[in-house]
Amino acid sequence: AEQRGHEIEFYNIRQCFMKLDATTPQIHYRGGSAIEPLDAVIPRIRPAQTFYACALLRLFESLGVFCLNNSDSIIQSRDKLFSLQLLLKQGVQIPTTGFASSPLDTNDLIEMVGGSPLIVKLLEGTQGKGVVLAETKKAAESVINAFKSLNANILVQEFIKEADGKDLRCFVIDGKV
């Protein structure tokens, strides 16, 4: 960016705060000074900062600032269930996936995805955290019930042996993978 003549500023999300009003909405930084108008924002957001960071991005968006990843796309990508629903809507094949609210549905959920082995995922986890391979039905029941006892939202997915423990990440830019 600098080689192309752009000026770059780095802002720590946790040190930004906002002013909302009808005439002069603003984003401020650290010592209280308003951030000067920006041409673009390239957000890098940790999962724990999603709610607050997306609120800031929505204000940037409403001020007409281009955001490389807009708030809606970040929120969609952080919600595994919603992401899977969006992929299905576009005709993308996904592993058979189950989602339920009650531990009473555990056995039906396990059978729905083809039985064990299966994958149990926390909806909020990232980078492989909160992902468990349950090799037996008993292990699956234990993991699901443990997560449910913590009121955690989980997905149960069929295990795809051919994936060899890896997932595939693709970027789509201007309609091309």
Please report, for each region that a protein language model flagged, where it lies by residue.
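ATP-binding N-terminal substructure of ATP-dependent carboxylate-amine bond-forming enzymes
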Residues: 1-68, 73, 82
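A conserved helix-loop-beta module that forms one wall/lid of the active-site cleft
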Residues: 6-13, 57-130
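Anionic group-transfer/hydrolysis microenvironments
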Residues: 14, 46, 123, 159-160, ...
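Short, hinge-like loop/turn segments at secondary-structure boundaries
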Residues: 26-29, 84-88, 113-115, 136-139, ...
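Solvent-exposed alpha-helices and their adjacent loops that cap or buttress functional pockets
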Residues: 33-35, 111-113, 123-126, 147-148, ...
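Short beta->alpha connector loops
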Residues: 47-49, 100-104, 161-162
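Residues that form or flank phosphate/diphosphate-binding pockets in enzymes
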Residues: 51, 78, 164-165
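Phosphate-binding site of ATP-dependent enzymes
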Residues: 132-177
